């Protein structure tokens, strides 16, 4: 996906002039970035004290909302499992791809009325995204439990004859059932030792029924064989079998239990399919909601920081740059040259973290212009 730089600079004689200067410096001869105006409406400014406090709160809100957006995106990838290549086409904002949404950003007046104070708007965003985050935790927990239980049952029916469930392999006819004296055991015999088994099983212990062993199934390494003997000889037979590298499985033929396991697996599989569609729909809708909220937080941050940096009356142009990956360093230099007059202390510093009291810029690059990164690379594929 894509990285954007959301910047602002004060209006020259007009904001259009600021825009034209940026375009001339970054696109005319050197193709350093693809640019778009970033439309921020006339928001209520409030007092300077409120703006300084809000700057800090918005930084925290930005990190929280970005985290929520990434969690929804990542969970979408987890839920789609084998269709992970389809994840990107499901990550939309207002029905369009993320790049289109950001480059054509329009403030959502219905969701975030600009008659409200900046603090109120930030609280509306925080409340909405907190709800999404909480709902995601609950839905993910329920679906993960269901998926985990199903995987555990599926795992039982996979693997080698030594470990897997034998319920799907054996039939009633393979056993002597309801006998007071006789019992049928299931034995895993390595293929290399099968000849030895056929020669020796009748004499491994006393009271083995002659010619009672048949091959019921096989995998790459072993055969599954049955053998019938007297109940009182079972312990001795197990011991001797182990000495000869034959593994006696703990298995009792119980039709009701086997039927219940099968029904449970079918139920879990059906439940998973039933929940899958609504869950993916919920993720799509709420990814869009969270992403839209995130870009509105970025807009709020640009507005607040621009007023704090450039003063009143409000007069700045917000601009969205999509840097050319190969020329990012050059773009930084060009922007620095273009705007270094805005802050003499930053003129010699490019990409150097600084603490500026009153402005929330610690742990972040400081430039003479307002700058926020928007990274649309929201997925971490394992």
From Swiss-Prot:
Keyword Nucleus appears in the UniProt entry: no
Stored SUPFAM superfamilies: Vacuolar ATP synthase subunit C
Keywords, ordered alphabetically: Acetylation, Hydrogen ion transport, Ion transport, Transport
Residue positions, PTM N-acetylthreonine: 2
Pfam families, per the entry: V-ATPase_C
Any GO molecular function: proton-transporting ATPase activity, rotational mechanism
Superkingdom in the source lineage: Eukaryota
GO cellular component: lysosomal membrane; vacuolar proton-transporting V-type ATPase, V1 domain
Family membership noted in the UniProt record: Belongs to the V-ATPase C subunit family.
Stated role: Subunit of the V1 complex of vacuolar(H+)-ATPase (V-ATPase), a multisubunit enzyme composed of a peripheral complex (V1) that hydrolyzes ATP and a membrane integral complex (V0) that translocates protons. V-ATPase is responsible for acidifying and maintaining the pH of intracellular compartments and in some cell types, is targeted to the plasma membrane, where it is responsible for acidifying the extracellular environment. Subunit C is necessary for the assembly of the catalytic sector of the enzyme and is likely to have a specific function in its catalytic activity.
Subunit structure: V-ATPase is a heteromultimeric enzyme made up of two complexes: the ATP-hydrolytic V1 complex and the proton translocation V0 complex. The V1 complex consists of three catalytic AB heterodimers that form a heterohexamer, three peripheral stalks each consisting of EG heterodimers, one central rotor including subunits D and F, and the regulatory subunits C and H. The proton translocation complex V0 consists of the proton transport subunit a, a ring of proteolipid subunits c9c'', rotary subunit d, subunits e and f, and two accessory subunits.
Name of the protein described by the UniProt record: V-type proton ATPase subunit C 1
């Amino acid at each position: 996906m894509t990285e954007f730089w959301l910047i602002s600079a004060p209006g020259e004689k007009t904001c259009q002039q600021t825009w034209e200067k940026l375009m001339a410096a970054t696109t005319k001869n050197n193709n350093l970035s693809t640019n778009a105006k970033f439309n921020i409406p006339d928001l209520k400014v409030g007092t300077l004290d409120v703006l300084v406090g809000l700057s800090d709160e918005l930084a925290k809100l930005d990190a929280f909302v970005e985290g929520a957006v990434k969690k929804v995106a990542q969970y979408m990838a987890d839920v789609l499992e084998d269709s992970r290549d389809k994840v990107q086409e499901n990550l939309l904002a207002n029905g369009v791809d993320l790049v289109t949404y950001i480059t054509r950003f329009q403030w959502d007046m219905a969701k975030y009325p600009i008659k409200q104070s900046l603090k109120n708007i930030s609280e509306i965003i925080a409340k909405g995204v907190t709800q999404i985050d909480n709902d995601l935790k609950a839905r993910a927990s329920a679906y993960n439990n269901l998926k985990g239980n199903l995987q555990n049952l599926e795992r039982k029916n996979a693997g080698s004859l030594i470990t897997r469930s034998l319920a799907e392999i054996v039939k009633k006819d393979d056993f002597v059932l309801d006998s007071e004296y006789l019992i049928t055991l299931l034995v895993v015999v390595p293929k290399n030792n099968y000849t030895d088994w056929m020669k020796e099983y009748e004499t491994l212990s006393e009271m083995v029924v002659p010619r009672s062993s048949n091959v019921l199934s096989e995998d790459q390494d072993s055969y599954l064989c049955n053998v019938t003997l007297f109940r009182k000889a079972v312990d001795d037979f197990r011991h001797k079998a182990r000495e000869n590298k034959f593994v006696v499985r703990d298995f009792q033929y119980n039709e009701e239990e086997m039927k219940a396991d099968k029904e449970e697996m079918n139920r879990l599989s059906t439940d998973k399919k039933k929940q899958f569609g609504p869950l993916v729909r919920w993720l799509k809708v709420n990814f869009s909601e969270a992403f839209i909220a995130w870009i509105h937080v970025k807009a709020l941050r640009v507005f607040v920081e621009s007023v704090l940096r450039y003063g009143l009356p409000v007069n700045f142009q917000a601009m969205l740059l999509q840097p050319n990956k190969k020329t990012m360093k050059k773009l930084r230099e060009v922007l620095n040259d273009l705007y270094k007059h805005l802050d003499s202390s930053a003129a010699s510093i490019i990409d150097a973290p600084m603490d500026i009291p009153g402005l929330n810029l610690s742990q972040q690059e400081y430039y003479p212009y307002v700058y926020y990164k928007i990274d649309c690379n929201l997925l971490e594929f394992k």
